């Protein structure tokens, strides 16, 4: 137990027989609860019937467009099937379009439509507020620490 305060019990240290395992102390359980809180706040504040994954794809595409679907998936931490479904829905809604890749006309790339750009503009302030509200129980220092720790394990 080098450099560890002995009064702090490790989060996941079940006994071999499992009798000290408590799901509410497990990282997966806590991350799921935090995500549920975030999704509920997001749904209540964001407009345009956007999901968290659609918003992630739109806002990242704004930064990196034009982009292949695979690149957008990597940039938003979505697997191939998930990003395909998200992009298909965004295309169907007229927020994203495909175009010939200017570097290789045989490939298609994704770009925001004017409506996609407008959707981002209408919702960007709400997105910032969603993050602030999600993290509202934390101090500024705790927010920074949480974000750094999450980046470290991702």
Task: Map each language-model feature to its residues.
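Generic alpha-helical hydrophobic packing signal
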Residues: 26, 53, 57-66, 70-73, ...
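Intrinsically disordered, low-complexity regions of eukaryotic proteins
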Residues: 4-7, 81, 106
